Amino acid sequence: VENRRQFFRLEYPAKSGPRFLSGGVSYQVLDISEQGIKLGAHSTRGLKVGGKFAGSLTFTDGETFLVYGIVKRITDETVSIQLTKPIPCRIIMAEQRRIIQLFQKRA
């Protein structure tokens, strides 16, 4: 299977990702990249493919990043968002280091 993604995607182990809040609804963050975010879809009410999506992504260090994008895919379990404003690479790299350190301690 060919991986056609243009950007590194950081997958989060269960319950270790940042918090995403949109329209008063909190979503579990499954993975992030500079150009996209995948959320757990416990609620897709009001979402449609092609629709605009905005919210705040709050990382465990307290940094908050405002997210703007378009809903690209909705499944029974996930919502995929293509971002119109990229997440800075420095944030992705810091999160990658945090995940590595967190799980090295557990091993």
Q: Where do the PLM segments sit?
A:
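Short conserved beta-strand and strand-loop elements enriched in small hydrophobics
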Residues: 15-20, 50-64
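Short acidic/polar mixed-charge low-complexity motifs
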Residues: 23-26, 61-65, 77
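Short beta-strand-centered aromatic/proline hotspots
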Residues: 26-29, 66-72
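Generic beta-strand structural signal
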Residues: 32, 73-76
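Short, conserved charged micro-motifs
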Residues: 46-50, 89-91
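C-terminal output/interaction extensions
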Residues: 79-107
